[in-house]
From Swiss-Prot:
GO molecular function, one term: zinc ion binding
Protein role: Catalyzes the hydrolytic deamination of dCMP to yield dUMP, the nucleotide substrate for thymidylate synthetase.
CC per GO annotation: cytoplasm
Gene name of the record: DCD1
UniProt name for this protein: Deoxycytidylate deaminase
Family: Belongs to the cytidine and deoxycytidylate deaminase family.
Alphabetic keyword roster: Allosteric enzyme, Hydrolase, Metal-binding, Nucleotide biosynthesis, Zinc
Domain CMP/dCMP-type deaminase span(s) in chain numbering: 162-291
EC number annotated for this UniProt entry: 3.5.4.12
């Protein structure tokens, strides 16, 4: 594992790096001369735990291609950073305004902004007590290292999602194509870890998009009169795209919102074996009853949002 650490000026990057080296026995790689040398060394020693301080976007762009790389960014309140700055000899004669200007000059360089925004993990240091902050850092680093070094992944790349996370993310991506005024919903149908069909909610093909006035019921803001809605549900779209023959046996339907009752009936008829959903819906109980009576496995799953934000 190689962890690259970046952060705002005087946010505590050095403390985090020193902790990884001293407490968690990571090897510091900042003694290496150039990006190619760093990349070559890290690749040859990818089974070892290493850490490097990231200052240049060009270095990040090389390292982030490797599956064993994790980017951690650090940030802290301005008051904490000003206090740390005052302890340095270069800040002895500076006013508060001058210190803040120096911090801003570092933090708001375009390259630095892009660098920090590309992090996988973001530690927000909010604990003002130094001793409490240190213990919180140890606890949270321990937790995140356990997640990254999950033995169940069987040597898989650090940030590689599980199948459930992968397909639920695809369902969420499909939802971004929704044209419905009410809500965005996405769906993916999978068999043997292969995508059969995707779908999102909105008006049928050749009709005006819902957000352009294509469905009067949705644009009216009325939650009643569902029978007048012209929008297809995400599950319906995916099921129509797949068809019963392509669904076959042991297919799983991933949906970022629990299927409604009418979609549940169609899911049963199409032969889906399992339904995995992320968010609840007001008709959950009726849907569960239909699906479970048909012998369909139903479970809730939510993937970890990225970047992962951790309060210290």
């Amino acid at each position: 594992m190689l962890i690259g650490v970046s952060g705002t000026k005087f946010c505590g990057c050095e403390d985090v790096i020193n902790m990884l080296v001293d407490h968690f026995h990571f090897e510091l790689l900042n003694h290496l001369d150039n990006p190619e040398e760093i990349l070559d060394y890290a690749t040859k020693n990818y089974t070892k735990n290493s850490v490097i301080f990231l200052e240049k976007l060009s270095l990040l762009e090389k390292l982030e291609k490797r599956p064993f790389f994790v980017h951690l960014s650090i940030d802290a309140p301005v008051t904490t950073r000003v206090a740390l700055y005052r302890k340095t000899t270069q800040a002895e004669s500076l006013s508060l305004e001058q210190i803040i200007q120096a911090i801003d000059q570092h933090d708001f360089q375009p390259e630095g902004i892009k660098l920090r925004e590309k992090s996988h993990l973001r530690f927000k240091i909010v604990n003002e007590d130094r001793r409490g902050r240190r213990q919180s850092l140890i606890n949270n680093i321990t937790t995140q290292l356990k997640i990254l070094d999950d033995k169940e992944k069987q040597m898989a790349p650090l940030m590689r999602p599980s199948w459930d996370s992968y397909f639920m993310k695809l369902a969420t991506l499909a939802a971004s194509r929704s044209n419905c005024m009410k809500r965005r919903v996405g769906c993916v149908i999978v068999r043997e870890c292969r995508v059969i069909a995707t779908g999102y909610n909105g008006t049928p093909r050749h009709l005006t998009n819902c957000f352009n006035g294509g469905c009067p019921r949705c644009n009216d803001g009325d939650s009643r009169n569902l029978h007048t809605c012209l929008c297809l549900h995400a599950e319906e779209n995916a099921l129509l795209e797949a068809g019963r023959d392509r669904v076959g046996q042991n297919a799983t339907l991933y949906c970022d919102t629990c299927p409604c009752l009418t979609c549940s009936v169609k899911i049963v008829q199409t032969g889906i074996s399992e339904v995995v959903y992320s968010q609840s819906y007001r008709m959950d109980e009726e849907s569960f009853k239909v699906l479970k009576n048909a012998g369909i496995t139903v479970r809730q799953f939510s993937f970890t949002e990225e970047p992962r934000i951790v309060m210290i």
